[in-house]
Amino acid sequence: MEVVEGRRKTCLDVVDSPSSRQKQTIAVSLVDGKNYPTRFLNSRTIDKLKQELNTSNLSTGEMSTNETLKNAQEVAGKLLSEENEDSISEHFDEYLGADKPGISFLTRLKTLESWFQSLSLQDRLTTLRTLLHHLPSQEISTLLSSSLTSSPSNSGLSLDKSLPSSPKGDSPSLSSSLPSLTTKSNLSGNLNMVTPASTQGPAFSSKHGFSNALSTASPIPVRTSSVSSTYLTQDREASSKNCLSKALAFSSIEPPASSASTSPRNTPTPSNNGTSINANVTSSLTSNSTGKTSKTTDLLIAASKKSLPSNSTPSKPNTSFFETPHNNIWDSRDRGAFSAPPAPFFPLGFSPHLNDESSRSRWSNISYSPPPPPPPPELLNHSPKSRPLGDKPYLFYRNNQIGPRTRTEGRSSITEGKPFLSSSLRFEHVPSANDLNSVVNARVEKSTGQPSTPLNRQHYFNELPHSTTPVTLPSLIHGSEIDRRRSGFCLNNFNSTPPFQPYHYEIGSGLPQQMHATNTILTNPIDPNSNISTPVGMHLCTLPYTYQPFSSVEKIETPPNNSKNQTYRRSSRGSNKTRKSISHSKNTDKHVGNELPQDIPSWLRSLRLHKYTNNLKDTDWDALVSLSDLDLQNRGIMALGARRKLLKSFQEVAPLVSSKKMNENLKAAKNQSSESLTSFKGHTDSEDLPSGSMSNEISSNSTKQDVSSSSMD
């Protein structure tokens, strides 16, 4: 009685609240932003509704919920039948017009939505039925016909305008969708009215309050057209149901400690394969839901079975015994030799820790890694695609697998003639079989310390025999560090510029000049056992090729007559013999400057065709360049290669011959012009000769007179 009476008062107070000037009941359609024409009831209708509700409340002291809804529907039907459509639209325009110009319609819409959600269950039903009475019959039939075809579970709403009520006239779809919107209502009191009785276990129903509402939810309706506000709430309910189902499925993967300790059904048994009972309950919960949610839950349950193995079966490694673990092969770029040494390599798969007493299944006592896989065939066979190797190609393979030796470790030639182990690249001497057996037995028989595994590398390194060489800085001999990084053919050497190079100071300049290793490398022959010219860890191999980076460019000291010009060349790493052969190689496209050779015999000698000098001795450059293949055959040059080489050389020399001819023509023209100029000057001098002779005669006469006068005196 008190609950029903309190809800009626709440409904009436909220209906009074929207406007202080006029009491209005406002309704809104909340379907994805498609707002249908909203209607408002005037104050006279609301006052009549209040009076009828108060009289029905006072006359019947105790009234059930169905009877209350029935009375409300009858009162609303009577009042709305007397209303006029013009007066309602007039109040609607007045509410949206000049009354409150500063408030937008969207703000009013949000206010109405929050007001509708604050109502109780019965108040919402009453309000919605009143609004449905108020809408025109044509609009109601259009909305509800499209809605009922998409979801048959919503057939509780009648299309009749009078909406005759019955004891079973409640709308199941609306009432089942209300728990997702009702935040302040008491769910425990209304749950039996909304959904049927729960079919789940008592423990799960008490733990999860929404399980009954979720199990009877209908699928998500298909939005074929604009629908009423009832289906928006149903969509919200379905989405919240999916979210809650996923949350319950996730919670069943790792149950809390309290539920696992208190409930005896959560213990792992052979029947449930180690998973908790929540996963089974969740799968039964989502069996009535959509197919998408059930598939998601099945995937989550399968993931929980994989992520939570049974405690009774011990875990074993999946790798095979003859499969090399990745972390046991030393990375070639890892320079920390003493921090991560590799395990010794036992040929033929022999490992001393596997004796008759210990079987192969004892994975906890493994101290050594299994042997690495055999090298690829292209490393051992001299294929044209691979680089040539030395006499001992297995050294190249092991060096590629393990890495180069550090610069501070010593070398020894004891490894020749002995079985090759990986420790020969790392330690001073190769341990024999007795030493290895003693070391392994001492490690296996230890009962106090933990078994040495490949992860415990420091303990493993201290027990193996090796030489304790003090770590000192390497002495940088002239160019040794540069050549160590550049001249090796193994893949572990970097193809980059060395990090540091020695410097020297020139006399007269205070700036340090970078010194390269060309002089020391080229003047000394390659020694396969030296530290300078061989790669690190490969002192038993020969060098099939030398590597020179592109960026190393050196200056050449030119002779004194051309000291002003600075020429550059690529510094070669070969020997003097190689340089000599390069200088005398067959080079047909290099000519000194843009000038022809001195004579044809010297040019033929540079082409290695000097035996044909007699065939071409009576020919000048112009006639030589114009010779064809037939002319060369007529002159006695029958070799096809020689003819082709000569014709190609003729094409290269032809521009020089033409330029020389042009220069000669210009020079001849210049000489001719100078000769004509000198002849013209001579002709002008001969024309001026009489006046000159006359002056000479006058001067001679004057001298004669002077002489005679002097004699008379």
From Swiss-Prot:
It comes from Schizosaccharomyces pombe (strain 972 / ATCC 24843) (Fission yeast). Residues 369-378 have a biased composition (Pro residues). Residues 189-208, 258-281, 321-330, 559-569, 670-681, 703-713 have a biased composition (Polar residues). GO terms for cellular component: cytosol; P-body. Keywords: Cytoplasm, Nucleotide-binding, Phosphoprotein, Protein transport, RNA-binding, Transport. Residues 570-583 have a biased composition (Basic residues). The keyword Membrane does not apply. Residues 154-188, 282-297, 304-320, 691-702 have a biased composition (Low complexity). Belongs to the VTS1 family. Residues 154-208, 254-336, 356-389, 554-596, 667-713 are annotated as: Disordered. The modification Phosphoserine is found at residue 673. One of its GO terms (molecular function) is mRNA binding. This is RNA-binding protein vts1. The keyword Membrane does not apply. One of its GO terms (biological process) is protein transport. RNA-binding protein involved in post-transcriptional regulation through transcript degradation.
